[in-house]
C-alpha cells in the first residue's frame, strides 16, 4: 500500500501488510560517512533483477546539479544505472546510508558518477510521508544570487557577502515580510 510519495526527492513509502520472513535494515547515519568509505549499491538496473555493485563515497554534500530542488547528495562511483533509483546504498556492515537516486552521464549511462539521498535527509522525508502522506516544504518566495564584490560594487553597497534578492514572488512569505527586489540579506 502506498503511504506517500515525493516526486521532488524521488522517494516513496510503502506499507507491506501480512508479509512474513522480512528482515529490516538498520538505518545508519550518513553524517558518519567519509570520502573514501566503501559502499554497496543495490538495485534493479534495466529490469534485470536484484543487482549489487560496489564502490566508494566519492564526495559528500553534492549540490547544484539541477536534479532536485533541495540537493545534498552522497556521490559514489558504485555503478548506478537506470532502474537503480530507490535502491539502497549501504555500508560494508549493511547499514542503509542512502537511497540511490540519479546518475550523471551521457545518455543515462553509468560513468562512475552516481548520487544517493543521504539517510539523515531520508529520515525527515519518511517522517513527513508517514505524518502527512506528502513532504511539506517551506517556500520563502525569493529568487536571487549570492552577493559578490562585483555585484556589491555595481549596486554601490558596502557589504560584499550575503544573498542578493533579484525578485520577490507576489503574496509569498518574503513579500508579506516586506522583502523587496534589490534587498541584500546578510544574516
Which stretches of residues belong to each language-model region?
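Conserved PDZ fold ligand-binding element
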Residues: 174-187
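Serine-dependent protease modules
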Residues: 1-177
Amino acid at each position: 500500500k502506498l503511504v506517500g510519495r515525493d516526486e521532488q526527492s524521488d522517494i516513496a513509502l510503502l506499507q507491506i501488510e501480512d508479509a512474513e520472513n522480512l528482515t529490516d535494515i538498520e538505518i545508519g547515519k550518513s553524517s558518519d560517512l567519509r570520502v573514501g568509505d566503501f559502499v554497496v549499491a543495490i538495485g534493479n538496473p534495466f529490469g534485470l533483477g536484484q543487482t549489487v555493485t560496489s564502490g566508494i563515497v566519492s564526495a559528500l554534500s553534492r549540490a547544484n546539479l539541477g536534479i532536485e530542488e533541495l540537493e545534498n547528495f552522497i556521490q559514489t562511483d558504485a555503478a548506478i544505472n537506470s532502474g537503480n533509483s530507490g535502491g539502497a546504498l549501504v555500508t560494508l556492515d549493511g547499514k542503509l546510508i542512502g537511497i540511490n537516486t540519479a546518475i550523471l552521464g551521457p545518455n543515462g549511462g553509468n560513468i562512475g558518477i552516481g548520487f544517493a539521498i543521504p539517510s539523515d535527509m531520508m529520515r525527515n522525508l519518511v517522517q513527513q510521508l508517514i505524518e502527512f502522506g506528502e513532504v511539506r516544504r517551506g517556500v520563502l518566495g525569493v529568487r536571487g544570487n549570492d552577493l559578490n564584490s562585483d555585484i556589491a560594487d555595481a549596486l554601490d553597497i558596502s557589504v560584499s557577502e550575503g544573498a542578493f534578492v533579484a525578485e520577490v514572488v507576489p503574496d509569498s512569505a518574503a513579500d508579506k515580510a516586506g522583502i523587496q527586489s534589490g534587498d541584500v540579506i546578510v544574516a
